[in-house]
Amino acid sequence: MLWKKRKVLYFAGISVFILILLLLKLNSKPKANVWPTSSKIVIYNRIPKTGSTTFTNAIAYDLYKENGFSVLHVNMTKNRQVMSLPDQYTFVNNITTWTERLPAFYHGHVAFIDFQRFGIANPIYINIIREPLERLLSHYYFLRYGDNYRIGLKRSRAGNNETFDECYSRGGKDCDMKQMWIQIPYFCGHYHFCTEVGNPEALRVAKQNVLEKYLLVGTTSRMRDMIALLEVTVPDFFKGALGHFDSLDANRAHLRYTKKKIPPNDQTLSMIRRDEVYKMEREFYDFINNLFDAVFKKATNGISKADDLVKLPLQYHFEKIKPS
């Protein structure tokens, strides 16, 4: 009889325990998709000939010791800017689990990768773009005359002194408007249509990614303003960046300056400005420029001075705190 009572109590206890577990499971809220290391990784998917070498070397590589972070270059095979889906997965997995390197600043000529597609929160994305024709001209003459960064290196078009005007008039490859289709794809990402020259969907997605996935995108002409914004927005990486940038001599503050550039004539400019690819890239540039200008003015209370930005007090405070 005693054994039967104990058996009943035993099964009753098990039933209550199972019931409690079920209730806890039903009442528990699903955990948010939080990646604790997301704020410890900055990705700068840099675009060629936009001042990216200056920004990377004069800021990231100069400040990593003082601010205590790692800097890593993402070297893309055969100068590709996109990865296969498996490579995207391993890339996301590698940099989010490589805890020994955190906090980390990654940079490389690679199109935007959306970490959220793999169930992980995106890191801090930043970038810099340049007026599209200026960027193309810089790249065109860079291939022929090189720059002030790696002086002894012979470039692929060395000895070819054809001007951009001459190239454009004969329909040359180096000055083809397909060569201008580069900044939109970098922000569009890895969808198949991103690299399709002149695809309107690529422009739409690029704009959307800038708004939703990037912390900040600046322009080459306002690099100093961008550095000031980053210093107060991501101080763990960019503390002291503006003062350091201002202390650099002219050569270090403008690395990879193309040695010789010949401005195109009015006829060439007129034809390029009517080209649909240029119009789209220019629309994207203006979109970024206007967005950055609005962010900067808001951050500086309309003063629009980088020097004042790092000194401005907070525009909010906490009060009525309970428990006191």
Swiss-Prot record:
Lumenal side, ranges: 25-324
Tissue expr: Present in the hypodermis, muscle, distal tip cells (DTCs) and in neurons (at protein level).
Transmembrane segments: 7-24
Membrane topology, from the record: Single-pass type II membrane protein
Annotated catalytic residues: H107, H109
Record note on disruption phenotype: Worms are viable but display axonal and cellular guidance defects in specific neuron classes.
Ranges of the Cytoplasmic topological domain: 1-6
Compartments reported by the entry: Golgi apparatus membrane
Any one GO cellular component localisation term in the record: Golgi apparatus
Coiled coil: none
EC class (word): transferase
Name this protein carries in UniProt: Heparan sulfate 2-O-sulfotransferase hst-2
Organism: Caenorhabditis elegans
Record lineage: Eukaryota, Metazoa, Ecdysozoa, Nematoda, Chromadorea
Gene coding for it: hst-2
